[in-house]
Amino acid sequence: MSEVPRIEYRTVDIDGVDVFYRQSVPTAPDAPVLLLLHGFPTASHQFRTLMHTLGDRYRLIAPDYPGFGYTSAPDDFDYTFDGLADTIAAFVERIGLRRFAMYLFDFGGPVGLRIADRMPDRITGLVIQNANAYEAGLSDGAREFTALSPDDEGAEDTIRGLLTLEGTRSQYEHGVPDPAVLSPEGWTLDQHFLDLPGRKQAQVSLAFDYKSNVEAYPAWQAWLRKYTPPALIVWGADDPFFPAPGAHAYLADLPAAEVHLFGTGHFALETHLPEIAPLVAHFLDRLEP
């Protein structure tokens, strides 16, 4: 039986941003390290059950981005994906991560791949969960969303429509056969943070910047081909934004990647932790330190 892990909750100042993070303390001091990069509209809280499941065996570290969760949201922060990556890259340096794998989910894909491009020699492997890096992985709705411009009439209203409790909850429930397995604290806590002063404007800015990620897809694909990191791909196949073709598309650049699809939506960890956690553990055990 696995031991109950010690989980720590800390905050560190990164260039004027109070970055909150949670980390597990494994029993072995040289345990593999996995940096958990969350998505939208959530924060490190989304990894709580994974950390309690695997935290005794691995050092799992999950920061909240600026404007998300318990991390501060300065008005003058650069709410772009470059800005998020700058902060998390500085966070990696501050806490002294030298060799680590990354768990990329949703927004964690663009953030993590920017970090990987800056420090390729530190990356031991990638766990990729509904984190798209291919045109084939964009649904029609996602294509329309990423094409939004601040100059488009009604564009900001469209974005803000996703930032309501109804919009947040639907991201959890869409594609889930049995919503009874979903804990309501996920979308409830997400909405609490979205409703804090300044948070929705930060999300609007990030939404308008999302096209920068699509433009970067070819460069990220080239990075994957060049460095060929070990990869585990776990994917909610019924994700309304990033459907199953996005998972298979990685095989063009990472032909040795392991792919597992699950009959669920965007937040696959919320519904399929018992299936995904052992896959992550087996993957981490195989990585070179």
Q: Model features per residue range: what roles?
A:
Residues 264-277:
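Catalytic histidine-centered segment of alpha/beta-hydrolase-like enzymes
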Residues 56-60:
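A generic structural motif
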Residues 40-51:
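The serine-hydrolase catalytic nucleophile loop
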Residues 1-28, 33, 41, 61, ...:
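Flexible "cap/lid" subdomain of the alpha/beta-hydrolase fold that forms the substrate-access gate
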Residues 66-69, 265:
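Adenine-nucleotide cofactor-binding loop residues
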